[in-house]
């Protein structure tokens, strides 16, 4: 996994690389991380090289330092590479969304983040998700419910969900 000072040496400009960006500790015993570990295991079995990149646990509420760190990562990745970004991280990156969309982004959505909150915070995430999900080219979803929610509530085209 890529952390801090090791990142500079290990990222390449190879456009065939696939990067997997997620917040926090992938070894935590939660459903989300178990799903993400399954993606990495599946890729390994299929001999697909996915390069995991762990971000801060602060997402979806990253600090300025967290955002700067991620921007440094992006600068070291070929823009034609595929970057799978976990929704928890992606939905905390709206301040740099235009930059992110210059890359080949695949959003991994467990469920829209607005569902985790109430009141103004929920409304804010719902607005941002509706605005930004339509700009993403591909999605990976973790359930039929999430797939249906993206199609029906966010108007994501079925062919964008892989």
Please name every model-derived segment:
Residues 1-56, 79-81:
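N-terminal subdomain of nucleotide-sugar transferases
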Residues 27, 46-96:
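Active-site donor-binding segments of glycosyltransferases and PAPS-dependent sulfotransferases
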Residues 33-37, 126, 144:
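Short, surface-exposed alpha-helical segments at coil->helix boundaries
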Residues 97-103, 133-135, 156:
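Short, conserved loop/helix-junction motifs that constitute active-site signature segments
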Residues 121-141:
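Membrane-proximal helix-turn-helix segments that form the acceptor-binding/catalytic region
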Residues 134-160:
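A short, active-site helix/loop in glycosyltransferases that binds the activated sugar's phosphate group
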């Amino acid at each position: 996994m890529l952390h801090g000072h090791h990142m500079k040496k290990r990222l390449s400009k190879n456009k065939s690389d696939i990067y997997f960006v997620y917040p926090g500790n992938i070894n935590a015993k939660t459903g989300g991380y178990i799903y993400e570990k399954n993606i990495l295991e599946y890729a390994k079995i299929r001999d697909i090289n996915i390069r995991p990149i762990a971000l801060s646990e602060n997402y979806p509420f990253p600090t300025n330092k967290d955002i700067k760190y991620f921007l440094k990562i992006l600068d070291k990745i070929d823009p034609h590479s595929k970057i799978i970004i976990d929704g928890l991280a992606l939905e905390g990156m709206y301040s740099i969304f235009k930059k992110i969309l210059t890359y080949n982004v695949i959003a991994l959505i467990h469920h829209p983040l607005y569902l985790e909150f109430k009141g103004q915070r929920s409304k804010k995430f719902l607005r941002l998700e509706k605005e930004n999900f339509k700009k993403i080219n591909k999605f990976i979803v973790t359930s039929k419910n999430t797939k249906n929610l993206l199609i029906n509530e966010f108007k994501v085209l079925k062919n964008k969900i892989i």
